[in-house]
């Protein structure tokens, strides 16, 4: 295995080859625009087969806890109202994407499940370029969307993958519960939970690569 570090406009990236498979890792930064541009750049440069997204998210439902892992099964937005015909076309892209990606998503979920310290939920997430730290807003978003978690970038990445016919596997670790008490500095015990979940994700990637 040969690991190579590359600087793409100060975006942390490394790439390595393992047999006939090539892996590329890049840090996009926050927000839909950065995430979408990074995703398209990787697809154009490396002609990828499957795109793995990893990051953190706020939990919208009380059944989730800090450090839980959400395997994304659908995406939507809470901050951009679309005309019905645009939304319909977008929904069709997304349905096709998750159908085409189902095998990869299930394989990766199985790899993650091998870690006894991981709590998994397979469910949709919702996105918007804003932080949510208000219980009423949180509950309203969850009720209207059916999503269990919220973040900034997943819908943009999923749409780029859909347009390019690239399979998508999205994973988010719950870092907060979208309430005011969680808006301050992250306590040490929470950091440890996030670290364990991140380690489980990396281990699952290694196991997925062996398949």
Language-model segments: residues:
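N-terminal short beta-loop-beta anion/metal-coordinating cradle
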Residues: 1-40, 45-46
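Active-site-proximal beta-strand elements of phosphoester/diester hydrolases
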Residues: 24-28, 124-126, 171
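Regulatory input/activation interfaces that engage signals or partners
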Residues: 168, 173-211
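Proline-aspartate-enriched helix->loop->beta-strand connector
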Residues: 47-52
């Amino acid at each position: 295995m040969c690991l190579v570090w590359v600087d793409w406009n100060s975006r942390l990236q490394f790439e390595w080859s393992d047999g006939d498979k090539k892996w590329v890792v890049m840090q996009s930064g926050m927000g839909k625009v950065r995430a979408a541009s990074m995703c398209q750049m990787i697809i154009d440069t490396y002609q990828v087969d499957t795109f793995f997204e990893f990051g953190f998210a706020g939990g919208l439902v009380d059944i989730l806890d800090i450090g839980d892992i959400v395997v994304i099964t659908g995406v939507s937005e809470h901050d951009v109202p679309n005309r019905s015909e645009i939304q319909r076309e977008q929904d069709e892209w997304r349905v096709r994407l998750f159908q085409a990606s189902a095998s990869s998503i299930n394989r990766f979920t199985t790899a993650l499940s091998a870690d006894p310290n991981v709590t998994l939920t397979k469910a949709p997430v919702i996105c918007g370029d804003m932080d949510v730290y208000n219980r009423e807003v949180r509950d309203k978003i969850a009720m209207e969307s059916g999503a269990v978690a919220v973040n900034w970038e997943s819908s943009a990445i999923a749409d780029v993958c859909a347009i390019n016919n690239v399979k998508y596997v999205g994973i988010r670790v719950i870092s907060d519960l979208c309430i005011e008490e969680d808006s301050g500095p992250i306590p040490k015990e929470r950091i440890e939970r996030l670290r364990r979940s991140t380690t489980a994700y990396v281990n699952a990637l290694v196991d997925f690569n062996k398949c």
